[in-house]
Amino acid sequence: MSVVPVADVLQGRVAVDQEVTVRGWVRTRRDSKAGISFLAVYDGSCFDPVQAVINNSLPNYNEEVLHLTTGCSVVVTGKVVASPGQGQSFEIQATKVEVAGWVEDPDTYPMAAKRHSIEYLREVAHLRPRTNLIGAVARVRHTLAQALHRFFDEQGFFWVSTPLITASDTEGAGEMFRVSTLDLENLPRNDQGRVDFDKDFFGKESFLTVSGQLNGETYACALSKIYTFGPTFRAENSNTSRHLAEFWMLEPEVAFADLEDNARLAEAMLKYVFNAVLEERADDMKFFAERVDKDAIARLERFVSTDFAQVDYTEAVAILERCGKTFENPVFWGVDLSSEHERYLAEEHFKAPVVVKNYPKEIKAFYMRLNEDGKTVAAMDVLAPGIGEIIGGSQREERLDVLDARMAEMGLNKEDYWWYRDLRRYGTVPHSGFGLGFERLIAYVTGVQNVRDVIPFPRTPRNASF
């Protein structure tokens, strides 16, 4: 007798007539007049539960089995048999059922066997992984993360762990969470009356990182190809379906790579991970296509079989201006494209994923390489049908004098970035990279509309529960 995951039973990896033990939670129980109960037991290893067939001859049938309700935890031992019923190929003829944990009050159990609204599930985020929806999201999230690691490993990249606490603002936007151990009731002040951060833990102002990019560049300029993958933080007071205060970012960085290399890497990466989900999580994707977004599977299949289009920002603006469509946000050269503009380009004009490149320098970060025209930078956004921007990246500015000039234009103190500038002083090279918001990727794959529902415990303005 061996303990096996439910997935092994349902997917035929356990021989018929083999005695096994499965451990999990009750999804449903139904009883027949013939003295047989049917337990649907899930353990999270796959989408479907396994059916355990329990005869009333078991010694604890009346006292325990007949009192099992949704959410109770059980250990079921029995033989794997071919299932005569529809819906699954195999079931377990139970010879023993142990109750590991009861649900205290089935009538008030928050995850009772019924469909709950997505808003309600956010209020019980500690229990929502027990639902079909969030369980499927969690498995897809895992598969995407593993596929990203696998892709970069196969491509010869090194994974670099960049710091979560930083004194640098990568985006230059100032929307950062401060990290401090100062006594808020008795803040030290300097001669100018300002908070004296010399007295703080790090001896200077410190923040939670908005990006691992700058640190990642230092390792790319030594190991050639690296990526970072971890949590990042933005103190944007944005209560939208696309924003989180804490989210995960994937950021590759490649030495000796230009913008075209960057675009090719982004395309190869996305197609690789989408194929992985289609192959490895067919059960969960079937659920998303049936219950969340009927186009979920077809969208990914189209994506992986379609070549990316490319267009300069200037031409993209011209396309939008002459398309005849009235947009909520006006279009003109110099404006940052909004989601409606991005989706029009990807869904209606190109009908394919599209890389928009060479944006006006005024709307992009200081580290992006200035183009020869002096007006645009070698930036790119990858736009996906159905969501808009899914990746943002650029070729980095490797020329020290140009980098210093851009910092001055944006009011940044170059001394704060002395170590970043050193990369341009000692063996500088062209290099490129991009950022992928992991939760937006999961939302795109699953069809789930709000990024709060694709991360275990969402952090948003005025919400840091659990």
Curated annotation (Swiss-Prot):
Entry annotated with the keyword Cytoplasm: yes
GO molecular function annotations of the record: asparagine-tRNA ligase activity; ATP binding; nucleic acid binding
Pfam families: tRNA-synt_2, tRNA_anti-codon
EC class of the enzyme, as a word: ligase
Domain of life: Bacteria
Keywords: Aminoacyl-tRNA synthetase, ATP-binding, Cytoplasm, Ligase, Nucleotide-binding, Protein biosynthesis
Single GO BP term: asparaginyl-tRNA aminoacylation
EC number: 6.1.1.22
CDD domains associated with the record: AsxRS_core (cd00776), EcAsnRS_like_N (cd04318)
Main location class: cytoplasm
Keyword Hydrolase belongs to the record: no
Record localization: Cytoplasm
GO CC terms: cytoplasm
PROSITE patterns hit by this protein: AA_TRNA_LIGASE_II
Catalytic activity: tRNA(Asn) + L-asparagine + ATP = L-asparaginyl-tRNA(Asn) + AMP + diphosphate + H(+)
PANTHER family to which the protein is assigned, alphabetical: ASPARAGINE--TRNA LIGASE, MITOCHONDRIAL-RELATED, ASPARTYL/LYSYL-TRNA SYNTHETASE
HAMAP family reported in the protein's UniProt record: Asn_tRNA_synth (MF_00534)
Homology family: Belongs to the class-II aminoacyl-tRNA synthetase family.
Assembly description: Homodimer.
Protein name as it appears in the record: Asparagine--tRNA ligase
